[in-house]
Amino acid sequence: IDELLEIKVNILIVDDNSPDKTYDVVEKYFGNNEKVNILIREKKLGLGSAYRDGFKWGLDNGFEYLVEMDADFSHQVNDLKALLLEKDEKNIILGSRYVSQGKVLGWSKRRSLLSKYANNFSSFITKSKINDMTSGFRIYSKYSLEKINYQNTKNNGYAFQIEMTVLAINNGVKIIEIPITFVERESGKSKMNSRIIIEALKYLFLYRFKK
């Protein structure tokens, strides 16, 4: 949070009543900082739901650009600076692990291959030229979110990122990929599980057969 505040951004933390007492920590250290906000939800409702609520909060509060990024140190503040330099009122800026100069640090070879193949498969099914369909490091403009009708998205796992990418392309919103260095989380466990994988596969096959 301190690093983000140095680049003069407003911060929203979406907390699904987490057992690590996220709210208490944020309130203790940043309770008097008007640039740090926290949105508390009663229970765990999923990644996509958190983004939808976060986007709504941002738009309701008059922000023209909204950044989504992980809070576990996987996404780097220096990369955010690079993404912000490219922001555009009509485009989506996507932090990509799988373009030239993009990197992933700290993953096993198996996990790296699984992620790369999953992204390639997603691109193939949706006929997209985007290399990192599941990236959770993006800058959305107000225009792009309204054009996509983000509030009508259905997915809650990593399929949410694929769905948002597909909706952007189908609605004529340009996506610009910028290389980032993704670093494996410093603590905690990955949210990836079989339910999330099944949701993504279901979305992709439904999308393919509807076309």
Where are each of the predicted segments found?
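Short, conserved SAM-binding/catalytic segment
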Residues: 28-33
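C-terminal catalytic/acceptor-binding lobe
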Residues: 172-211
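Catalytic donor-sugar/metal-binding loop of nucleotide-sugar-dependent glycosyltransferases
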Residues: 129, 152-156, 165-181
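Residue-level signature of catalytic and energy-coupling elements of molecular machines
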Residues: 54, 72, 141, 168, ...
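Short beta-strand/loop segment that forms part of the nucleotide-sugar
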Residues: 1, 8-18, 39-40, 69
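Acceptor/aglycone-binding surface of glycosyltransferases and processive sugar-polymer synthases
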Residues: 41-60, 65, 77-158, 185-200
